[in-house]
From Swiss-Prot:
Region: Lacks the Ser-Xaa-Pro motif that is crucial for potent interaction with nAChR, residue numbers: 48-50
Cellular component, GO, one term: extracellular region
Lineage of origin: Eukaryota, Metazoa, Spiralia, Lophotrochozoa, Mollusca
Entry keyword set: Acetylcholine receptor inhibiting toxin, Disulfide bond, Ion channel impairing toxin, Neurotoxin, Postsynaptic neurotoxin, Secreted, Signal, Toxin
Cystine crosslinks: 46-52, 47-60
One Gene Ontology molecular-function label: acetylcholine receptor inhibitor activity
Protein name stated in the entry: Alpha-conotoxin-like PuSG1.2
InterPro entries: Conotoxin_a-typ
Length: 63
């Protein structure tokens, strides 16, 4: 029974760590802080368009 409890706790910690890492990565991409090619492509495609820039101010820097 003790081994099962240890396994459950280990899986919960692993899941929490993986979820936190993914969440932080998404937040960085959404705020324009991630320098990866996907976020740059989205920003470059959206920011020149006034409607997209207005709907997504979190990815377009202020002018």
């Amino acid at each position: 029974m003790r081994c099962l409890a240890l396994l459950v706790v280990t899986l919960l910690l692993f899941t929490a760590t993986a979820t936190t890492g993914a969440s932080n990565g998404m937040n960085a991409a959404a705020s324009g802080e991630a320098p990866d090619s996907i976020s740059l492509a989205v920003r470059d495609d959206c920011c020149p368009d006034p409607a997209c820039r207005q709907n997504h101010p979190e990815i377009c820097p202020s002018r």
